Amino acid sequence: HVDQKGQLAVSEDEAALRPDAIIVSIMTENNETGNLLPIAEIGALLREHPAVFHTDAVQAYGKIPLEINENSIDLLSISAHKINGPKGIGFLYKRDGLSLPALLHGGEQEEKRRAGTENLAAIMGMAKAASLHTPEAQQAAAEQYQTFADVLMETLAAQGVDVQLNGDPAHKLPHILNLRFPGVSSDLLLMKLDLKGAAISTGSACTAGNVEPSHVLEAMVGKEHPAIRESVRVSFGYGNTLAEIEAFAQLLAETVLATKK
């Protein structure tokens, strides 16, 4: 269960945690809103519980430091493409002493956990991408993404666009913005922007092509809330420039105002 800002209520999670629970799996950062979820609090809750604690850190890896030991994380998964590495490769961190059964049998690869020839080129590409995400690089990127987010929101406000931020402004990363434009169909807005060369979405890449509303927004505001059909997801990457964001912000403002008419 999440609140209207998309945040987990740890007290409710604690109440729902059964003594015989085997694993607890929580995202580090939501991939539609950019919200940072209370991993530290959940990790503290699980210190006295036998359940394995897994976090999907795909969206957050390379953006923020991941305090694995401090947060009592047992398993952590990432994907290389989120740090501009090759697609189709990732890794799973496993705490020392935790036993995992084999995923695929028949070979000695990956400590007998996944049989089959490793994709060495993709592995090396992932390692190279990871090596570039130093603490200094992460900090510089975070500051750049915050500037991009500020420019976008300030431009929309200056143009008189009615816009609302879906999510928790106090606990989120700036490279993902989930924006609601009241009275504007998100599907129509996406189509118009696509024709003008701007790529945004109504959800994550995992749900691309899905005509169903965002399950994330449904959990936040309910299935019948108009925000479900009036919200879009905007994300920034390391290759974006300030000039691109300024141009996109102006284009988005003009398109929203024209669509609302």
PLM region descriptions:
Residues 1-261:
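Pyridoxal 5′-phosphate
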